[in-house]
Regions:
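Cytosolic juxtamembrane amphipathic/interface segments immediately preceding
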Residues: 5, 65-83, 217-221
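Hydrophobic alpha-helical membrane-embedded segments
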Residues: 15-44, 186-202
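Membrane-interface amphipathic/juxtamembrane segments adjacent to transmembrane helices
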Residues: 28-72
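Aromatic- and Gly/Pro-enriched helix-to-coil junctions and flexible linker segments
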Residues: 61, 75, 95, 102, ...
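Alpha-helical transmembrane segments and their membrane-interface junctions
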Residues: 87-107, 166-181, 234-253
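Long, contiguous internal "core" modules enriched in hydrophobic/ aromatic residues
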Residues: 103-220
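Alpha-helical transmembrane segments
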Residues: 132-140, 198, 266-276, 300-307
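Membrane-interfacial entry segments at the cytosolic side of transmembrane helices
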Residues: 148-157, 252-256, 280-296
């Protein structure tokens, strides 16, 4: 019953997380587009009110005319819409989802079976520390360098280095799947913290000053704008990190930290293309095609790097998954292995979760035909990733895994 309820919690939280993330990313991307597409107002009355940019748009059969004030409007309306619950709801639902999956099952997801020194409680603390420590370091960088000359460039370079170091460390401490997801959660935490600690408080100070008839300090808008820009460049890397959990050949590579960094870099470059494209369409900037070209080139390079190779090369490069300590290589001597040798292993260790009564992940392994249909998944989970049997992967010896490997590499036959 506990497993059933956890599955429902996982489903509902994942659904909620996707819904709120769509709302947050959508509003964030819209305002980046809006800021990049504003043109000086033509109406003299708007200029006198302090408007420094406007946009005319048509959507859904209606015409829209948003304007942006240089600092603040002369007076505030009775109702002012705020954009923050999209961010808070996304982070809260994401952290809840992280808790019921990775933290609740820390032994299975956060602790590598070859690392006897990492206790599940230690892994949980380390995972949470990644979220907090990165925010503190990132925030410190922004505080120290953000308002200096060329501060944006300095902050960008330092944060890029910090993300690279975090990726390397995460892939050393945690299994690749957890490392990739934690990197996404780490950046998403910084994004939401930017909203909570800087963007919204700064806006509240501006509103309070206007209500009290006091002059508005433009630094609040400048800081909020800087953090908002950071958020837009974090977005695509975060989305990649979350989606990567479905593709084991990414996070199980021997140099998975570098794979992660390169894919995040590609995402940031592609996002830069779209950000600058709005200014190009207005004649303000040169065509940003170099950023798109750079992002696509990195993607093609990673694609070529991770291309499938011979089975022997795969087994040599993938079992360790670049985590510490490295897993022992699976010995493959012993010739071909038939289904008759494989079946007892499946019956003893796999059918309990993948049989007639229960089919985890929709996989059933209690017949030769089903086993053959899922041969590639069996090979990946048992030999390459060494994650199965789930929750107790150490129950299978290297000899058992070598048997599965020989069976798969000699054709995955199930005929007697």
């Amino acid at each position: 019953m506990e497993s059933y309820l956890l599955d429902w919690a996982n489903l509902l939280l994942r659904w909620l997380h996707v819904i709120t993330a769509i709302a947050w990313v959508g509003s964030s991307f819209y305002f980046v587009f809006l800021d990049s597409s504003l043109t000086p107002p033509e109406d003299e009355d708007l200029k006198r009110q302090g408007v420094n940019g406007e946009l005319w748009a048509v959507h859904g059969g209606g015409f829209y005319h948003p304007v942006k004030f240089n600092v603040a409007p002369p007076r505030l309306p009775g109702h002012l819409h705020w954009f923050y619950w999209e961010s808070y709801s996304t982070w809260l639902s994401g952290f809840a989802l992280l808790s019921v999956t990775y933290l609740w099952n820390a032994r299975a997801y956060l602790v590598h079976p070859a690392d006897p020194l990492m206790h599940p409680h230690m892994a949980i603390v380390a995972a949470l520390a990644f979220l907090v420590v990165f925010w503190l370091l990132y925030d410190g960088i922004c505080r120290v360098f953000g308002q200096r000359p060329r501060g944006d460039a300095i902050v960008g370079a330092l944060v890029a280095v910090l993300v690279g170091l975090a990726a390397w460390l995460a892939c050393r401490l945690f299994p690749g799947q957890a490392a990739f997801l934690l990197m996404g959660a780490m950046l998403a935490t910084a994004m939401s913290a930017n909203v909570f600690f800087w963007i919204i408080p700064g806006q509240r100070k501006v509103v309070k000053a206007l209500q009290n008839g006091q002059p508005v300090d433009p630094v609040h808008g400048q800081r909020g704008k800087q953090r908002s820009v950071h958020n837009t460049y974090f977005t695509l890397p975060v989305l990649f990190a979350m989606l990567s959990n479905h593709y084991a050949w990414l996070y199980s590579h021997a140099h998975n930290w570098l794979v992660l960094v390169l894919m995040m870099l590609a995402g940031a470059a592609i996002r830069q293309f779209f950000v600058l494209r709005h200014g190009y369409k207005l004649g303000r900037r040169p065509h940003p095609w170099p950023y798109a070209l750079a992002g696509v080139a990195v993607l093609i390079g990673v694609l070529a790097w991770l291309r499938p190779v011979s089975p022997s090369a795969v087994s040599a490069s993938m079992p360790g998954a670049a985590v510490a300590p490295a897993l022992p290589a699976v010995a493959v001597e012993g010739g071909a292995a038939g289904y008759a040798q494989l079946a007892p292993l499946l019956q003893q260790h796999c059918v309990i979760c993948h049989g007639a009564a229960l089919q985890q992940k929709g996989v059933r392994l209690d017949s030769p035909q089903q086993v053959q249909a899922h041969a590639a998944q069996i090979y990946q989970q048992v030999v390459q990733l060494r994650k199965m049997p789930f929750g107790n992967p150490g129950v299978l010896s290297d000899a058992d895994r070598a048997l599965v490997q020989r069976w798969y590499e000699t054709g995955a036959q199930v005929a007697p």
